[in-house]
């Protein structure tokens, strides 16, 4: 389980996260939505130790993150898929996928490559194993990034707006891969996204944020058909029209 307990985050005097209390259960698919600047990405980055909280606690598998242990804990339990793919340009797709398992988890090259091909098959890119990232489309690069996160076999995968940097025509291929993972895997997923169709189909629970706070929390069927707050109704009214 990942827990945020009374988490506050400041950038200077700007109060970015305001008393966030949130838990993510093992195997859950949690989707965080809200307008730009609402604190969604900061929340998910705090879960992974990429941002230090100003006050409160982040707890991963009953371990409280601090500046001394957060790298060790997050390397063990959390994988992250970013808006931008962060692939190593000088390495092939296969090398990108095997680097962390071999270097950090001390897997043999044979075992790491077997795992890499397994997940390249999941994302539909086995034929791209020996090419370099620059030869791939944005959608293909993001699918490689997802495969890389799966190769680490960590129990939590955090997705920070994984389609926001993609051309519209490539967004669906990435969403399809994420849907496949959600249906076939016990992996816990936390997804920050503006893709409402994906949220409806995949989420076990929706978190709606505004101005650094959790405004509403509900199951998708209730959230999308009958939101409890006026702010969520206004947000959905605008975003579902587009």
From Swiss-Prot:
Gene3D superfamilies attached to this UniProt entry: P-loop containing nucleotide triphosphate hydrolases (3.40.50.300)
Domain ABC transporter, first and last residues per copy: 2-236
Amino-acid positions noted as binding ATP in the UniProt annotation, renumbered to this chain: 34-41
GO molecular function, one term: ABC-type amino acid transporter activity
Cited Pfam families: ABC_tran
UniProt cross-references to SMART domains, sorted A to Z: AAA (SM00382)
Keywords: ATP-binding, Cell inner membrane, Cell membrane, Membrane, Nucleotide-binding, Transport
Membrane topology of the entry: Peripheral membrane protein
GO cellular component: plasma membrane
Compartmental location: Cell inner membrane
UniProt xrefs under CDD domains: ABC_HisP_GlnQ
PROSITE patterns (alphabetical): ABC_TRANSPORTER_1, ABC_TRANSPORTER_2
UniProt keyword annotation of NAD present: no
Similarity-based family: Belongs to the ABC transporter superfamily.
Function comment: Most probably involved, with PEB1, in a binding-protein-dependent transport system for an amino acid. Probably responsible for energy coupling to the transport system.
UniProt name for this protein: Probable ABC transporter ATP-binding protein PEB1C
Organism: Campylobacter jejuni subsp. jejuni serotype O:23/36 (strain 81-176)
Taxon lineage: Bacteria, Pseudomonadati, Campylobacterota, Epsilonproteobacteria, Campylobacterales
């Amino acid at each position: 389980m990942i827990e945020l307990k009374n988490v506050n985050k400041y950038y200077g005097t700007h109060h970015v996260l305001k008393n966030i209390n949130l838990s993510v259960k093992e195997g859950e698919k949690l989707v965080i939505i809200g307008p730009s600047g609402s604190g969604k990405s900061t929340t998910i980055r705090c879960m992974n130790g990429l941002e230090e909280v100003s006050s409160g606690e982040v707890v991963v598998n009953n371990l409280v993150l601090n500046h001394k242990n957060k790298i060790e804990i997050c390397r063990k339990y959390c994988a992250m898929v970013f808006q931008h793919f962060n692939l190593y340009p000088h390495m092939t797709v296969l090398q990108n996928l095997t680097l962390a398992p071999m270097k950090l988890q001390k897997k043999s090259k044979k075992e790491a490559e077997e795992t890499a091909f397994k997940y390249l098959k999941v994302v539909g890119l086995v034929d791209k194993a020996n090419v370099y990232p620059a030869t791939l489309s944005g959608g293909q690069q993001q699918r490689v990034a997802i495969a890389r996160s799966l190769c680490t076999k960590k129990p939590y995968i955090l997705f920070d707006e994984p389609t926001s940097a993609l051309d519209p025509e490539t967004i669906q291929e990435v969403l399809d891969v994420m849907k496949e993972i959600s249906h076939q895997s016990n992996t816990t997923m936390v997804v920050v996204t503006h893709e409402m169709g994906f949220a409806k189909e995949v989420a076990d629970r929706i978190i709606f944020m505004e101005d650094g706070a959790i405004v509403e929390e509900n199951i998708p069927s209730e959230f999308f058909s009958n939101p409890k707050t006026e702010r969520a109704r206004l947000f959905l009214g605008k975003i579902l029209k587009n």
